[in-house]
Amino acid sequence: RQRQMCIRDRHISVSRAKYTIDYPAGFMLVASMNPCPCGYYNHPTKECTCPPGAVQRYMSRISGPLLDRIDLQVEILPVPFDELASAPQGEPSAAIRERVIKARNIQQQRFADEPAVHCNAQMNSRLMATHCVLDKDSMAILKKAMTRYDMSARAYDRILKVARTIADLDNSPSILPHHTCLLYTSP
């Protein structure tokens, strides 16, 4: 419970017999794990050797409330050697860096009058109501996903904040359907 409050509130309280001290605890959590004990669940070419129920037991070692506080959850499949050895494809790192800098500048301007807020991840409900407005199509997509994956209110907030960030990276003043639909690959 203390960990979850630390992640949400970005501070931690340490209590001793006669006093309580608050410490700042803003951080970015980056974590990884295998999809199952053997590492081959959902692998495109290798078969998972885990006995029935092992994958579920393995996944349940991470609490649902903790997973619910991780903004981005991405399954990464192995890359075949031929793709690794070929010339790089996609957007160059320098171009991505420029998009990120522009998005951070957009957020800095957006929250210039909010001393405790520097980026979309730090938005409270009031700021989300102002800056994370969805059009009719985006709301329909979100409603369908929330129902299909039985997502929590915390997941709803997380999706809106990440969609706002994707829109910023796209230099879009509005959150559009394609900014939200990328977020439903993991419930």
Which role does the model predict for each range below?
Residues 2-3, 187:
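Positively charged, low-complexity/disordered segments
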